């Protein structure tokens, strides 16, 4: 356990000088001997015994000359069943005022990704109960899903609904990593889990937006380490990350503070490598699976921005939320033409599901093309076939909406879970013209097709 002294403090970056024969390794955790007991993580070795570190907490009250000790290892966090039902910070310390975490076992947050031989893939579908997702971009068990959307189109609400539906229907363990998001949402989420009686199956790790960049950069790794432990014990784990963009943003802040030259749009030059290091660890092995659902903020609604563009490469399914669809009052505001999944293959999901999904996409795409003609010349100028197609498209568009359980408080409508079988049957019926006689308003904000038929009787 060598010790050194602080020689420079610039924001969250602290330089510490050690004797030359005992310089700490990269990623070692250092402890500042002060009242706050701040933890530092070594990022660079500058030579002459000086290391540049990033603080995992506030640097208020620190000054030059304070003693710092090297722990000799990376940051480690508690893992295992004792973490379930608890809220922890980036260092694995409990922040829910419910006493210490009762486990001796701790794992370092920097771990190698599973080797090629250890990895395992699967094609089992994971039903979410959300019509548009199950139909157009089905999730795979052990797959990686991204929820892409700009500000305020419903990423977190969709994420909460997915957690509610999957965590309640799915009997395994879940880990939720709140990376640089609102503390209020973290609090809402905790109470949502508590009220649904699934809190004892969820471990919560928060590094919210008011915390220093070091915390936001590492909190995703803390959550992932806990998920890896459950996976290696042979469980099927769900890992929720909200929001992966804030992880990139924290990396940008740290990179600038460390004096690296920025790359495209001001992002860190190591963007792809940092994302790869995180994403390659989120994978399924022969022991167990990690199914991960990640919210991805899209700056200025531009999907070609380097951050969302780098994330795309790692995902099996992408759910794109659209502001145009949200402005029509259709929630969830998922764009069925922009969202994709690797599972959308007749050999995986079956011919009926595949044909229905592609049929829905064809009708919506054709409607999109006809919109300009309708805007200029009106509906009367369309051929009978096109008129019929437009009417069906409008019904499909409305039938893709659905009341959420987590939004009951705001909408007053009770949430609906729609099975995959009912989803396919409903859309297939609309495509075949079985419901051409029903008004389009009957399809808005309902669960299955039976409910739409009932609603039509009241209109």
Curated annotation (Swiss-Prot):
Any single Gene Ontology cellular-component annotation: proton-transporting ATP synthase complex
Membrane topology (UniProt): Peripheral membrane protein
PROSITE patterns with a match to the protein in the record: ATPASE_ALPHA_BETA
Subcellular location(s) per record: Cell inner membrane
Enzyme class, UniProt record, top EC level: translocase
CDD domains hit by this protein: ATP-synt_F1_beta_C, ATP-synt_F1_beta_N, F1-ATPase_beta_CD
Record text on subunit structure and interactions: F-type ATPases have 2 components, CF(1) - the catalytic core - and CF(0) - the membrane proton channel. CF(1) has five subunits: alpha(3), beta(3), gamma(1), delta(1), epsilon(1). CF(0) has three main subunits: a(1), b(2) and c(9-12). The alpha and beta chains form an alternating ring which encloses part of the gamma chain. CF(1) is attached to CF(0) by a central stalk formed by the gamma and epsilon chains, while a peripheral stalk is formed by the delta and b chains.
PANTHER family associated with the record: ATP SYNTHASE (PTHR15184), ATP SYNTHASE SUBUNIT BETA, MITOCHONDRIAL (PTHR15184:SF71)
HAMAP family: ATP_synth_beta_bact
Protein name: ATP synthase subunit beta
